Amino acid sequence: MYVISIHSVSNPDAFWGGQLDLPEGTELPLVAPSADGSRGVCVFKSDSVNTVRNLVDGAAGTISRNEFYAINEGNALGLPA
């Protein structure tokens, strides 16, 4: 499944400069930060929303408020192949 994560970032250098340790079966094909780094959207391919939530919230700590949802693949356009 594809999962969207939306980020409101208080420390862009730390957030976007960090490295995620992706668990087996999870991919991150798209990262789209705003010009100033204070907002961003990522597309993950993973087994569940909770896997992505635990990964991002665990890595970001208090420097980002995050939202997550599963993409409705039947109505989506342009998902990574």
Language-model region placement:
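Short S/T/G/P-rich N-terminal loop/turn motif that feeds into the first structured element of a domain
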Residues: 1-39, 45-57, 62-64, 68-81
